């Protein structure tokens, strides 16, 4: 079921220790970055997460039904304001549900 109170707001990532959040995406949760420090750098961990997250979506392991509850939600992680795997999740959610659109989308 769609949470209409969140429709129209963008899914975004906030620091869970400095801001209110709706969904915890810290390591160890369903949405957490399981790659972690083994990747060597933050950027490498985010890139590995992105590739695997997209693979999981394509394989059906993560479905639209999993992602829809994240619409308009504040995803809480400890990374922010630094780059975060949650940025990948938020971007995909916003694009999938057209909550984040391009000017070209207005012409279609």
UniProtKB/Swiss-Prot annotation:
Pfam families: DUF4326. InterPro entries: DUF4326. This is Uncharacterized 12.4 kDa protein in nrdA-td intergenic region. It comes from Enterobacteria phage T4. The gene is y14A.
């Amino acid at each position: 079921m769609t949470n209409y109170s969140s429709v129209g707001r963008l899914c975004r990532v906030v620091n869970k220790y400095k801001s209110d959040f709706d969904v915890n995406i810290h390591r160890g949760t369903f949405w957490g970055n399981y790659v972690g420090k083994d990747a060597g750098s933050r950027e490498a961990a985010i890139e590995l997460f992105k590739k695997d997250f997209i693979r999981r979506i394509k394989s059906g392991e993560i479905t639209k039904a999993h992602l829809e509850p994240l619409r308009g939600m504040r995803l809480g992680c400890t990374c922010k304001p630094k780059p975060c795997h949650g940025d990948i999740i938020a971007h995909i959610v916003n694009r999938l549900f057209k909550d984040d659109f391009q000017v070209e989308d207005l012409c279609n």
